Amino acid sequence: MSPKTRLDSDFFGPGDRWQTVAGVDEVGRGCLFGPVVTAAVILPETAIAPLQQAGVTDSKRLSQRQRQQLYPLICEVALATGWGLASVAEIERWNILQATFLAMRRAIAKLDRPISRCLIDGNQQVPQLTYPQTTVIQGDRHCITIAAASILAKVWRDRLIERLDERYPGYALGRHKGYGTAQHRQAILQLGPTPLHRIRFLRSLRQPSQQIDLF
């Protein structure tokens, strides 16, 4: 974490303890392909300093190798972990924001411990959540539990997309993990979308000069 890191406990309410507070984050909101994935994690206070020393921070600031090294460490020391997924069909039906909230609720529901509060990355509260919650802007940079959740979500989703790369060759999914790189966009224009591409997102690819009708 950075020198400006705030302790998660800065966001605790009365009665909250480390062992009852869950950090929650998502990955894949801006992708053209695949589900949005979320993770929730509860850490013991004794794990905070070791995880900070190990380099746990926002997953986007870490290399793939660093994330893969930290993933088993987080799982080992965590009191509880949970993952949630919202499918492409759910993203298409509800929109990406509501699908992300759905995935977050699913991840939190898989935590097998009492929960007194959820620390949510971002500035929007999760609707229909039955626990008290606090949103933290750039929480994955400031809160160790949210940072840990960001790593768990990122590694889990990356592994899923790498498996799907074998099912849908030609799109280089294993390289860009479904994000809208130039290579990915060009592959879609050449090959057309797969069943796991987000049609709402792909509409932005349509240009008058393109001779290929994707839809």
UniProtKB/Swiss-Prot annotation:
Gene Ontology molecular function: manganese ion binding; RNA binding; RNA-DNA hybrid ribonuclease activity
Lineage of producing organism: Bacteria, Bacillati, Cyanobacteriota, Cyanophyceae, Synechococcales
Gene Ontology CC, one term: ribonuclease H2 complex
Gene name in the database record: rnhB
PANTHER family: RIBONUCLEASE H2 SUBUNIT A, RIBONUCLEASE HII
Annotated residues for binding of a divalent metal cation: 25-26, 121
Main location: cytoplasm
A single GO BP: DNA replication, removal of RNA primer
Name of the protein this chain belongs to: Ribonuclease HII
Keyword Acetylation among record annotations: no
Pfam family, one: RNase_HII
Protein family membership: Belongs to the RNase HII family.
Cofactor or coenzyme needed: Mn(2+); Mg(2+)
SUPFAM superfamilies on file: Ribonuclease H-like
